[in-house]
UniProtKB/Swiss-Prot annotation:
Region span, Disordered: 204-224, 825-931
Gene name of the encoded protein: ULP2B
Single Gene Ontology MF annotation: SUMO-specific endopeptidase activity
Entry's Gene Ontology BP terms: protein desumoylation; proteolysis
PROSITE patterns: ULP_PROTEASE (PS50600)
Compositionally biased spans, kind Basic and acidic residues: 873-904
Enzyme Commission (EC) number: 3.4.22.-
Active site: H489, D522, C577
Superkingdom of origin: Eukaryota
Keywords: Hydrolase, Protease, Thiol protease, Ubl conjugation pathway
Stated name of the protein: Probable ubiquitin-like-specific protease 2B
Amino acid sequence: MKKNFEVFDFKEEDELAESAAGKLLEKFTNPSPCNSPVLQRQRIQSFCNEKRVEEEEMEGPSCAEPATAVESDDHQCEDDSTLVTEAKESRTILTFGLETTDHLEETDAEHVNQGLMLGLKTEDLAKETDIDHDNHGLMFGLNSEDDIEETDVDHRVESFSCQLGGNSFYAETSSYSQRQLNSPFSDSSSSEEQIDMMSAIDESLSDRSALSEASDSEDDEEDWMTEHCFNDEEKIDLSTAVIMTSEYVILKDMHCAASLVIFSCNGIKIKSFLANNEEVPFSCEFGVEDIVSIQYNWYQNVGLIILRIRVLLKDENCHEDMEELKIAVKEHNWPNKQQKINSLHVKYPAVWNTDLEDDVEVSGYNLNQQKRYFPSFDEPFEDVVYPKGDPDAVSICKRDVELLQPETFVNDTIIDFYINYLKNQIQTEEKHRFHFFNSFFFRKLADLDKDPSSIADGKAAFLRVRKWTRKVDMFGKDYIFVPVNYNLHWSLIVICHPGEVANRTDLDLDDSKKVPCILHMDSIKGSHAGLKNLVQTYLCEEWKERHKETSDDISSRFMNLRFVSLELPQQENSFDCGLFLLHYLELFLAEAPLNFSPFKIYNASNFLYLNWFPPAEASLKRTLIQKLIFELLENRSREVSNEQNQSCESPVAVNDDMGIEVLSERCSPLIDCNGDMTQTQDDQGIEMTLLERSSMRHIQAANDSGMVLRDLFDSGSNNTGSLLEQLQQPFEDPSSFYHLSNDSSAREQVDMETGEQFMCLNAGEGNFQCITETTSPRASNSFSSWNLGIPLVQKEDETDLLSETSNSSNDSIGIIEDNPIENTHEEEIDESPPRETVSLKSATVGSNTADHTTENEEPVSTHIELVVPSSQNDRDEEKPLEHDLEIGDKTSEDVGDDCDQKEPMEEEDEKRAAKRPRLSSPTGEAEEMEK
């Protein structure tokens, strides 16, 4: 069958279209001043002004008044028939060259002697009549994008329908537009109707032109709007108000299209046009006192303002409630408008840009129930380490948190922080299925810091990160997540079931539940092209590293591993790519099946589809991460506060616990209840409070009921260094709280339970450092001590030994027992062991020191205190220590009173001299025995 190609032949009719197209294209070149629309409009005005009559002499309705544009059908038909008859007599035809998507056929020149063409041009082509037929064409450039049906010239059907777009003059009603366009012209000398029509068109054009975007006069616009939207009683003073034309107004469930928005000193008034074909025009008014806040979004490129005004409304019961009034206004010069509005009343600048996150209460009712969370970090910010104790922990500083502000790029610290957070949310039994790389892995893999062009070299890329995965079973994981930061953009790589590549063939993979593949999730699709080869090569090299004998078949499978670029929700701005990465990852962890296959992704669940989630949901992650960091800060503050409270509180007495405190005698033997110490250069001593019961277990007792302190000292070790050597081993026991320091200088430590500070000294050191302060009074700590059970009767050899040691020095050592002699046996069998105090003190202290006796409120419990002083020249370790032993009873006193009263030990001893059983004489008595 022969095809007909005549439709492709070039005809003479096409020449007209080509010529019309050429003329249209000429208008897009440098404009000629003689053909400007302004000059054409001036020609029309001059033509009409010559034959214009006074408006008072006109009869019939005026087309220039839109309020009276809607007339009865009888008058309209009568006017139309009269005008058509006159047009036939004058053989004048009004042709409107209306351009639509189709080309208009040329008007038959034989039937037209004079033609007036009003061309409402758009982007399509219009054919003009041949000027050889002496047609006088007059064109109005009234650029419209809508379609108008052309008049049937042959049958003289004068029916038009016009729908004017946004770029043409405004016409609220179809009747007004139809009345304006359905009026043909007669000859200029035939009748007054032509003059009326031209006058009406001219007035209408001048009125409507003020509302178009090309209008140069703002005052004309306001005059026109106030004239057609308000009656005489509602006229407003333009000098004290700001008027704007809205695209739409929304208040609760009420919607209104074109209307006026008036800001005045009294408030805000909204009124729709009178000709909106509504029974009751939309109107509302709010006083200045009813305005709660005003916020706006200015889209400067299109000149659109979205106003969100929160106002107070009263219901039928006169209860106030807050509603949002949303207004869209087209305004290119918004800053000037805003300045004028603020000058109307002092309330406007006060409520402008009010933070809507603050709760607003009206009559005791919280109007903002759904308060969005935006934490403030104005206070000093302490770095957050998360997760604490993890080798991959992330440290977040204040600068990182500031990047969570709107319209800001998030950095790698925020990305890694939230990935660690998601990783910790996974169940413990499920963690082995996932592996998460941090944001630095891809940077190291692609070597972006040195040579970004090497991103295609997979072998070299693997060698750079080989240590990262040496201890990770990469091919035993179900999912491996790789955050990608490349070319200032974030995306996510998910490697699914990589171990299945070597275990299954391509034929098996189609029917397999686990299909190995690489998923690329990109919020700006196409921006990270070129990652396919890098990831495939890396996996191949990783497999070869773990399997030395790898066949070429398996290598080819890795190199041909499926790389799927998913169609996912896309970001709507240029700075939320990192948030989309995190949201992709979070939703994938929540919805990913145990066995994944890209061939079995169903649209029913929206999983990994374009409608997976709304884009705004990912953008809101800024607030979520801010809240999460703020909660971590609060938890850390509570922990620190609890530690401080525990350090200030007295610990609970436990029978097996003791405190240890090693002090320098250089800081003096005088210690008050607040931990302050007075220094003396001559007298030195050591005060020790035992920590653990196990610390004294190595001490051997002289008999079954007690302990002898001479076992602490060797015959050849009489200095303080050897004493510390004896005590060092029990301190290093794991059960003790602190160990002695091996540093050259003393180190201060704090007991976390009691809050006290301790000084640990090296063994053998004679120069002790003083503790400047203690966090809590030493005497306030009530420790349960070990019942030493010191015997009341001393053996002869022990007495001799003690006498010998007392002769070698002027120092004296006293052991004072709190228990009376008659109650000794009763206390030994008591269930609660008594608390005792052992004092080793220097005789050289004399009256320069005030040794205190500690008393407890409990009658059965006593306190043990060891004071080991040295001689004045204890810096010289070769000088021996001379001790004397004194054993006696004492009663307990309140520690607080002891600190305040500071009674010396000598007065206590004199009062209780009769009650003390002397097992060894004091210093003076020892000297008499020697004599």
